């Protein structure tokens, strides 16, 4: 595990590296329930493909990937990233996965999102961070972190024999700075 880079009362974020590989991490990526709201659910992840991803992730200049660890015991419970960073437009997409099911609904995701949004605006000088999701719990988590609804991509996701809308949300730096105390 890399040293802690960002932390809150609940979680710490560290750069995601090959040392983060574990059987439990691999199992998350292949767990149908964990990936219910992910496109990756249709493609099996092998040990080799995960290790390759972890080796190569630091070579990408348009994304930053972090492991999410519970602060109390530093157990790796998920990952969070800013990806598709457009440096000129100063915007990025946010991605998050809480793979440890025992950590669901306990505020870890909300806390990790708060940390990475603050990092994106204060350290990377971004102006906009956006997401697309059709996970109702994720929508609530993003709303808690000042994300605003911007639109819907109708019937974009096909899962379990039905189409689902993809909710588009974003937070702007100006809105973030109005509500936080630095």
Task: Show where each model-derived region lies.
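Conserved catalytic-core motifs of GNAT/GCN5-like acyltransferases
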Residues: 130-132, 148-164
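Acetyl-CoA-dependent GNAT
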Residues: 45-102, 172
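Conserved acetyl-CoA-binding loop-helix of GNAT-fold acetyltransferases
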Residues: 105-119, 139-144
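Conserved active-site tyrosine of GNAT-family acetyltransferases
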Residues: 142-147, 169
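Conserved G/P- and acidic residue-centered "switch" motifs that form tight phosphate/ATP-binding loops
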Residues: 74, 107, 161
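Short hydrophobic/aromatic beta-strand or adjacent loop that forms the aromatic wall/cage
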Residues: 63, 164-168
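A short, well-structured alpha-helix characteristic of acyl/acetyltransferase catalytic modules
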Residues: 1-51, 175-182
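Conserved GNAT acetyl-CoA-binding A-motif
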Residues: 122-133
């Amino acid at each position: 595990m890399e040293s802690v880079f960002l932390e809150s009362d609940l979680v710490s974020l560290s750069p995601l590296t090959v040392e983060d590989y574990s059987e439990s991490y691999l199992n998350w990526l292949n767990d149908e329930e964990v990936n219910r709201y992910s496109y990756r659910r249709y493609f099996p992840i092998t040990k080799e493909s995960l290790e390759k991803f972890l080796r190569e992730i630091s070579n990408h200049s348009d994304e930053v990937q972090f492991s999410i660890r519970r602060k109390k015991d530093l157990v790796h419970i998920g990952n969070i990233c800013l990806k598709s960073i457009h440096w000129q437009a100063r915007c990025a997409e946010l991605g998050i996965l809480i793979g440890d099911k025992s950590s669901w609904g306990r505020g870890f995701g909300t806390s990790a999102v708060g940390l990475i949004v603050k990092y994106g605006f204060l350290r990377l000088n971004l102006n906009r961070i956006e997401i697309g999701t059709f996970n109702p719990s994720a929508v609530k988590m993003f709303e808690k972190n000042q994300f605003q609804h911007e639109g819907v991509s109708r019937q974009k996701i096909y899962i379990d024999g039905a189409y689902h809308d993809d909710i588009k949300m974003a937070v702007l730096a100006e809105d973030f700075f109005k509500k936080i105390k630095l």
